[in-house]
Amino acid sequence: MKAFTKITAIVAPLDRSNVDTDAIIPKQFLKSIKRSGFGPNAFDEWRYLDHGEPGMDNGKRPLNPDFSLNQPRYQGAQILLTRKNFGCGSSREHAPWALDDYGFRAIIAPSFADIFFNNCYKNGLLPIVLTEEQVDRLFKEVEANEGYRLSIDLAEQTLTTPGGETFTFDITEHRKHCLLNGLDEIGLTLQHADKIKAFEEKRRQSQPWLFNG
């Protein structure tokens, strides 16, 4: 998993509430269990003018010019700004996979669906909860300023605007540690590999019958 420390990046606005996981990555693309390759189909039904299916050449598909993420000013964005209850609907880890593969490192919203929120942390995405008033202000600034960038410092738990205004956000110490060090659940377990090995060796000596056959 990629570590997250600090970024300064373009912000892309998605001015919609209750964006569900089927909108983030439609169900027909869920057959693969690889974590990569979902980016071109993120927001597929809004992003393209035709219906997408696995195996299609996305480079030849007609883009929807009215979809915000297709606008030239938001290309290369690594921060997604959106509205309340983002990631609702069915539980699918493919949703954060698709957003990560698109290039997003952080998502800002007033609220997130619980399962999606947890899945973001497991896949190196930083979900940031701000108040609706703060999110409204950011939407206005993004709209008014082309190339608008925010700076996020995870260690300090701060988000800073180009004008120098700083917002703070909450995150548990455990999740912060994992993101700062790029640790998923496997990586976190491997940090204790020596202790696990020592425990198993001690148990092998004290309870050898468990290891016979």
From Swiss-Prot:
Any one GO molecular-function label of the UniProt entry: 3-isopropylmalate dehydratase activity
Keyword Kinase on entry: no
Enzyme Commission code: 4.2.1.33
A cellular-component GO term for this protein: 3-isopropylmalate dehydratase complex
Entry keyword set: Amino-acid biosynthesis, Branched-chain amino acid biosynthesis, Leucine biosynthesis, Lyase
Pathway membership: Amino-acid biosynthesis; L-leucine biosynthesis; L-leucine from 3-methyl-2-oxobutanoate: step 2/4
InterPro entries: 3-IsopropMal_deHydase_ssu, Aconitase/3IPM_dehydase_swvl, AconitaseA/IPMdHydase_ssu_swvl, IPMI_Swivel, LeuD
Pfam families referenced in this protein's UniProt entry, alphabetically: Aconitase_C
Database matches in SUPFAM superfamilies: LeuD/IlvD-like
Reactions performed catalytically: (2R,3S)-3-isopropylmalate = (2S)-2-isopropylmalate
Subunit structure: Heterodimer of LeuC and LeuD.
Name of this chain's protein: 3-isopropylmalate dehydratase small subunit
